[in-house]
């Protein structure tokens, strides 16, 4: 039976004690509280904390380069993950951070990973502060599919392929830019803020609604997505998979890479 890319809070409540399940708390905030501190104050029972920075590389453009295979392998082993383990990842940010680990696990060949739909908000049960005792797992990273990753040079050469900007509309338009040196977007990019993949209650929209959203933008198989640093873009990649638009690709360095180059910048609500 296939697993993922989403599980409901009801499913997790039913399976929380399964021996072949690992729950990972992946909370992180760009300009907010420390995720580990939040984990220590309370987390889903049995959940193990994994820090975004621990699965972020040191080579490549942007603020959050993709990790080396050994980094993901080591962190997953420390979390108790084996090759056959189902992994559920959650955050408190609508899945916009958890989707990054979902993407990385798939990219490194795990194949049994899911995001908790609605995250902490949907859990709705008591939290615990006890740190679980974990037996080191035997997870092994497989060689990643490099065709799903684009760098600055590859994005410059894109022709006839939709380029999607997953950031908030104000950052796309260039009205504000909280962290990077330039405001605006990559010329030609279409605005598809990740938050619009969600309903008002914080759950993902239906597959049909997501399909309508992305097809109306002209998104097709092989579309490229970017955000600020390659984290939140994975939310759009997950939504595209739910919508039946497979093989989405990631501009890993995203705007934090593009804006540091001597490259053209578009502003306003049009792609430019």
Regions found by a protein language model. Give the residues of each.
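Conserved beta-strand scaffold positions in the cores of enzyme catalytic domains, especially
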Residues: 23, 47-49, 113-115, 163, ...
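Thiolate-centered catalytic microenvironments shared by cysteine-dependent enzyme domains
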Residues: 63-158, 175, 231-254
């Amino acid at each position: 039976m296939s697993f993922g890319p989403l599980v409901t809070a009801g499913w997790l409540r039913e399976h929380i004690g399964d021996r072949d399940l690992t729950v990972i708390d992946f909370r992180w905030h760009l300009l907010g509280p420390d995720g580990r501190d939040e984990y220590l104050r309370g987390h889903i029972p049995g959940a193990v904390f994994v820090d975004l920075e621990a699965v972020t590389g040191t080579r490549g453009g942007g603020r959050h380069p993709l990790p080396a295979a050994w980094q993901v392998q080591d962190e997953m082993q420390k979390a108790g993950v084996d090759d056959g383990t189902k992994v559920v990842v959650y955050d408190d940010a609508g899945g916009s951070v958890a989707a990054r680990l979902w993407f990385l696990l798939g990219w490194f060949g795990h194949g049994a990973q899911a995001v908790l739909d609605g995250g902490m908000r949907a859990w709705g049960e008591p939290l615990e502060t006890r740190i679980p005792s974990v037996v080191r797992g035997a997870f092994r990273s497989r060689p990643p599919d490099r065709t799903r990753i684009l760098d600055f040079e590859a994005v410059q050469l894109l022709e006839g392929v939709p380029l999607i900007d997953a950031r908030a509309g104000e950052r796309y338009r260039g009205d504000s830019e909280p962290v990077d040196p330039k405001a605006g977007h990559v010329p030609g990019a279409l605005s598809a803020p990740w938050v619009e993949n969600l309903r008002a209650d914080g759950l993902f929209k239906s597959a049909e609604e997501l399909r309508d959203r992305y097809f109306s933008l002209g998104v097709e198989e092989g579309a490229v997505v970017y955000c600020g640093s390659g984290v939140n873009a994975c939310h759009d990649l997950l939504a595209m998979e739910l919508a039946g638009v497979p093989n989405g690709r990631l501009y890993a360095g995203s705007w934090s890479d593009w804006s540091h180059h001597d490259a053209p910048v578009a502003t306003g609500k049009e792609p430019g």
